[in-house]
C-alpha cells in the first residue's frame, strides 16, 4: 500500500505516540502535519483545507477530542470539509466506539497501538479511491 505523497493532518496529544506515527508514516513517504489536540486540527484544516488529503484524529485529547473535531470539520461550510477522509485512531476498539466514530462523520477506525500495514491500507483506500475503508 503506497502512501507516498499523501498529506496527513495528525492530531495526537501523546508526544511519544505522535513521534512514532510521524516517523513511521514519513518513512513510508507521507507528508505529515502534527498537532496536539482537536481544536488545533480544526484550526489547521480551516487555515489550509487544500493542504491535506486525510485527517487522523486520536479520540481522547485535551481541549477537544477527535469526535468533536470530526463533527466540527464536517459542519464547516465548504465542500472539502464534507469530503476529506477522517480516520479515528484510538485504543477504544469496541463496536460502540467504532459506531460513534462513524456517526461523527469519520470514514474509518484504526486501533492503537496501530498496525502500520493496516493504517497504510486504510489510508490508501480512503485517499486513492475516495471511498470508505472497512
Kindly give the residue locations of the regions a language model identified.
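C-terminal compact regulatory domains
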Residues: 1-134
Amino acid at each position: 500500500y503506497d502512501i507516498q505523497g499523501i498529506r496527513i493532518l495528525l492530531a495526537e496529544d501523546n508526544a511519544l505516540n505522535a513521534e512514532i506515527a510521524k516517523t513511521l508514516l514519513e518513512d513510508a513517504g507521507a507528508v505529515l502535519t502534527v498537532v496536539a489536540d482537536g481544536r488545533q486540527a480544526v484550526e489547521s484544516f480551516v487555515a489550509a483545507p487544500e493542504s491535506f488529503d486525510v485527517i487522523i484524529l486520536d479520540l481522547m485529547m485535551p481541549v477537544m477530542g477527535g469526535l468533536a473535531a470530526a463533527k466540527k470539520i464536517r459542519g464547516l461550510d465548504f465542500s472539502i470539509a464534507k469530503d476529506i477522509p477522517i480516520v479515528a485512531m484510538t485504543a477504544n476498539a469496541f463496536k460502540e466506539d467504532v459506531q460513534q466514530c462513524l456517526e461523527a462523520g469519520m470514514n474509518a477506525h484504526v486501533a492503537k497501538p496501530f498496525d502500520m500495514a493496516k493504517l497504510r491500507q486504510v489510508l490508501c483506500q480512503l485517499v486513492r479511491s475516495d471511498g470508505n475503508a472497512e
